[in-house]
């Protein structure tokens, strides 16, 4: 490691401002925070920033559903996000929003520089338009089948299954995610970033050797497939920044979202006054820039983002660190099973340090998915943190407090053992630097096993009962506490709250350099419980709470959905199909109503005398609730003339009058247009 402190700017991907933080998000933020805390522990200068990704049609539509402005909604979500991250001890130096003055200024500047340098063009394109909502459909509001791998139910910009990016018009069988309607094509002028002009630069950047091999290999696939111009504009209505000099045209959210890294840092510079924005972002910057992201957004960060920066005169990232997804109990996070756990729900039931430790224990520097096995989570935290590490302090601290007034021995009895523990610092440092946190944890727990073996062999609880062995007891416990101190120094980036409580107990700050020398002739404070084991019932309660939250949210969402319009067919579906010959048997005729009277002792029936063209018929019809008899005399209607006469209580009915409606007062007699004559056949 260089002697001079490094200057690093570190970012996490920007959470979208239309939903809550969940344990999938937390993998990235914990991974980045551990790395950042390690860098700070080694004396490097780190600026750790993030922001909410606050633009796009999804936010605009959700705000409408909630009955508030997009600005009010993203402010509310930002407060929730920051509260959750703080709950997990994510040590951001600044948390901002892409909907900010800084981001508007920088997005406009970068666009205009790209345009000036010949990297922006425009052309008329045909794009999908929702005929019901009368709006162009952004990528994420079209769903269909991926044109490459044929996976169904994929969004209109990229496929979650194979990672391919494409235009919404390339989707197979597209549907509007807003209304469910089949979109139609409509012309619109759009603006494009000429990504192919940067292919040579991007290939060189890929071959630099700093990118993860999986990322470099994926980029090579994209190069072989041919880079395409990138559509960076969207049509109104849209919540975002208008493109300078254009009417009703907005920057696509993926243009201004990564610029949000710059906007958040600019905001931090303005707050602090001792930071130089240009020192970190100029093309010749000597500082280091790192992005932690998920594997679903590699395309944007490894192709578009470095090309945009290069084309507008800014520096490119030093590296992009990509991680996989979180699964729970070997399966995709599920709301119905309660394994889709919000950060806030977790914090209501469990210590955030437990998840920080478990994620660290399973993380490596590859793009592997991480499985949060809840049974293993409970067992590993209890076995490693409680039984091996914290217990090491509790087994020794009581004797130091009670027998030696809290004073460690002036003599360190096991220099060779301590040298082994201190000597692991370089190896563990290399692993933290390389983001091989799981391997670092294994090194630390292996040392913890050795420390506990030492205490078991020395048995201070036995020595304490032996007369004249006070010095031996103090020496043993001093060694045990010092080994605990070394372990907690190594764990400080992973478990900062536990490290802080340890520092209070030791009455000394834990520093990486301090590991080199044991703590002797030093007073510690009375020992208090440093960490609580996980009760499986806490995990069960968290899962049940997640199920309940998901059910309540689904019920609320269903209630908020516009009810599909009830139609007459939905209320009274069609009867089974019949053959034409069956229908041809029915003889429908125009009939003139000669007389009409109410049938006594009947609530429904009217008695009609009908002229069907030279023949008079008596017909009873159940439309009494809808008509006054005298209003019908002289009208024309339609009758089934060849229906077999039916004897009724009040007389013989020689046909059937046709009427429409659900019943009661909602009945309407069928009447032909003027010109129809009694006896005419209805064709």
Curated annotation (Swiss-Prot):
A motif ('HIGH' region) lies at residues 15-25. Is required not only for elongation of protein synthesis but also for the initiation of all mRNA translation through initiator tRNA(fMet) aminoacylation. It is found in: Cytoplasm. Keywords: Aminoacyl-tRNA synthetase, ATP-binding, Cytoplasm, Ligase, Metal-binding, Nucleotide-binding, Protein biosynthesis, RNA-binding, tRNA-binding, Zinc. Gene3D superfamilies: HUPs, Isoleucyl-tRNA Synthetase, Domain 1, Methionyl-tRNA synthetase, Zn-domain, Nucleic acid-binding proteins. Its cofactor is Zn(2+). InterPro entries: aa-tRNA-synth_I_CS, Anticodon_Met, Met-tRNA-synth_bsu_C, Met-tRNA_ligase_1, Met-tRNA_synth, Methionyl/Leucyl_tRNA_Synth, MetRS_core, MetRS_Zn. ATP binds at residue 335. GO terms for cellular component: cytosol. Belongs to the class-I aminoacyl-tRNA synthetase family. MetG type 1 subfamily. It catalyses: tRNA(Met) + L-methionine + ATP = L-methionyl-tRNA(Met) + AMP + diphosphate. One of its GO terms (biological process) is methionyl-tRNA aminoacylation. Homodimer. Binds 1 zinc ion per subunit. A motif ('KMSKS' region) lies at residues 332-336. It comes from the Bacteria. Residues 582-683 form the tRNA-binding domain. The lineage of its organism: Bacteria, Pseudomonadati, Pseudomonadota, Gammaproteobacteria, Vibrionales. This is Methionine--tRNA ligase.
């Amino acid at each position: 490691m260089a002697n001079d402190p490094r200057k690093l700017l570190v970012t996490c991907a920007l959470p979208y401002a239309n939903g809550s933080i969940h344990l999938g998000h937390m993998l990235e933020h914990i991974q980045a925070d551990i790395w950042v805390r390690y860098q700070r522990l080694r004396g490097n200068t780190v600026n750790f920033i993030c922001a909410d990704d606050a633009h796009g049609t999804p936010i605009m539509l959700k705000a409408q559903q909630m009955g508030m402005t997009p600005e009010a909604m993203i402010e509310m979500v930002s407060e929730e996000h920051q509260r959750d991250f703080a709950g997990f001890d994510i040590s951001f130096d600044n948390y901002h929003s892409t909907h900010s003055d800084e981001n508007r200024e920088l997005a406009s500047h970068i666009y205009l520089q790209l345009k000036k340098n010949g990297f922006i063009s425009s052309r008329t394109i045909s794009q999908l338009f929702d005929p019901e909502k009368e709006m162009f459909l952004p990528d994420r509001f079209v769903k269909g089948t991926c044109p490459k791998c044929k996976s169904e139910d994929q969004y209109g910009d990229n496929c979650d299954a194979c990672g391919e990016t494409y235009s919404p018009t390339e989707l197979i069988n597209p549907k509007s995610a807003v209304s469910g309607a089949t979109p139609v094509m409509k012309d619109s002028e759009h603006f494009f970033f000429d990504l192919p002009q940067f292919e040579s630069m991007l290939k060189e950047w890929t071959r630099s050797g700093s990118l993860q091999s999986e990322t470099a290999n994926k980029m090579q696939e994209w190069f072989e497939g041919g880079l395409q111009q990138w559509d960076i504009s969207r049509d109104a209505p849209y919540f975002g920044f208008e493109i300078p000099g254009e009417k009703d045209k907005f920057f696509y959210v993926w243009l201004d979202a990564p610029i949000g890294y710059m906007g958040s840092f600019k905001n931090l510079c303005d707050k602090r006054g001792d930071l130089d924005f240009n020192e970190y972002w100029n093309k010749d910057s000597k500082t280091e820039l790192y992005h932690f992201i998920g594997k679903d957004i590699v395309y944007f960060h490894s192709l578009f983002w470095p090309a945009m920066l290069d084309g507008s005169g800014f520096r490119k990232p030093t590296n992009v660190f990509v991680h996989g997804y979180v699964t729970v109990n070997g399966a995709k996070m599920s709301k119905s099973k309660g394994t889709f756990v919000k950060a806030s729900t977790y914090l209501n039931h469990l210590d955030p340090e437990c998840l920080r430790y478990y994620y660290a224990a399973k993380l490596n520097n590859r793009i592997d998915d991480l499985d949060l096995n809840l049974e293993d989570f409970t067992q590993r935290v209890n076995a490693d943190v409680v039984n091996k590490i914290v217990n090491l302090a509790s087994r020794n601290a009581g004797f130091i407090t009670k027998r030696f007034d809290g004073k460690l021995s002036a003599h360190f009895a096991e220099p060779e053992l301590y040298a082994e523990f201190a000597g692991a610092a370089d190896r563990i440092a290399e692993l933290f630097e390389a983001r091989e946190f799981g391997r670092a944890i294994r090194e630390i727990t292996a040392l913890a096993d050795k420390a506990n073996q030492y205490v078991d062999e020395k048995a201070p609880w036995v020595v304490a009962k032996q007369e004249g062995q006070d010095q031996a007891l103090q020496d043993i416990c001093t060694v045990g506490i010092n080994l605990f101190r070394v372990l907690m120094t190594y764990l400080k980036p992973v478990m900062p709250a536990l490290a802080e409580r340890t520092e209070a107990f030791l009455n000394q700050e834990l520093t990486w350099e301090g590991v080199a020398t044991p703590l002797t002739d030093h007073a510690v404070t009375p020992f208090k419980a440093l960490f609580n084991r996980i009760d499986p019932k806490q995990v069960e309660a968290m899962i049940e709470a997640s199920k309940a939250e998901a059910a309540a949210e689904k019920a609320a969402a269903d209630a908020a959905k516009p009810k599909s319009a009830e139609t007459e067919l939905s209320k009274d579906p069609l009867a089974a199909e019949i053959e034409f010959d069956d229908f041809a048997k029915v003889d429908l005729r125009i009939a003139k109503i000669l007389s009409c009277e109410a049938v006594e002792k009947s609530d429904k029936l009217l008695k009609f005398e009908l002229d069907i063209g030279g023949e008079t018929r008596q017909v009873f019809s159940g439309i009494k609730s809808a008509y006054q008899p005298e209003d019908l005399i002289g009208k024309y209607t339609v009758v089934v003339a060849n229906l077999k006469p039916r004897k009724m209580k009040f007389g013989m009915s020689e046909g059937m009058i046709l009427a429409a409606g659900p019943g009661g007062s909602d009945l309407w007699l069928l009447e032909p247009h003027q010109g129809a004559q009694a006896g005419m056949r209805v064709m």
